[in-house]
Amino acid sequence: MGNLARFGVSLDQDLLEPFDELCRRKSYPNRSEAIRDLIRKALVEEKWNSDAHGAGTLTLVYDHHKNDLSRRLVQIQHDDHDLIVTTLHVHLDHYNCLEVLVLKGEPKRMRALADKLIACRGVKHGTFTGTTTGEDLA
């Protein structure tokens, strides 16, 4: 962190009390660190709405014995291979697999890929989380 700038924040007590509780639950050492995280989150969301590059993770849980699901998932991934940095495949039990894809690229394309994979028949659960590459973020 470069030069620190101090500024005052005025909040209604009805907003401050739950904020302080949030800070305690999340183990923030002080309000300033919590506010910095909130600002970073807003900046990342703003960047995601632009055409800037981002990163993300896609987590899928599926039964690999279902139909032709494994082949379909791999085929879809190959169609957008330039977005996929790496994958992790875990056998949860005899039937269920957990697959984690680390993505990097244009947010719209990453979201579209995630939507395609999550929508495949046989995928039991899927979650996409977008984030920043860290550029231009203090």
UniProtKB/Swiss-Prot annotation:
Presence of the UniProt keyword Ribonucleoprotein in the record: no
GO biological process: response to nickel cation
Keyword list, A-Z: DNA-binding, Metal-binding, Nickel, Transcription, Transcription regulation
A molecular function GO annotation: DNA binding
Domain of life: Bacteria
Binding site for Ni(2+): H78, H89, H91, C97
InterPro entries xref list: Acetolactate_synth/TF_NikR_C, ACT-like_dom_sf, Arc_rbn_hlx_hlx, CopG, CopG/NikR_regulator, Ni_resp_reg_NikR, Ribbon_hlx_hlx, TF_NikR_Ni-bd_C
Pfam families found in the cross-reference section: NikR_C, RHH_1
Cofactor: Ni(2+)
Cofactor binding description: Binds 1 nickel ion per subunit.
Function: Transcriptional regulator.
Listed NCBIfam families: PRK00630.1 (NF001884), PRK01002.1 (NF002169), PRK02967.1 (NF002815), PRK04460.1 (NF003381)
Family per record: Belongs to the transcriptional regulatory CopG/NikR family.
Protein name, as recorded: Putative nickel-responsive regulator
Organism classification: Bacteria, Pseudomonadati, Thermodesulfobacteriota, Desulfovibrionia, Desulfovibrionales
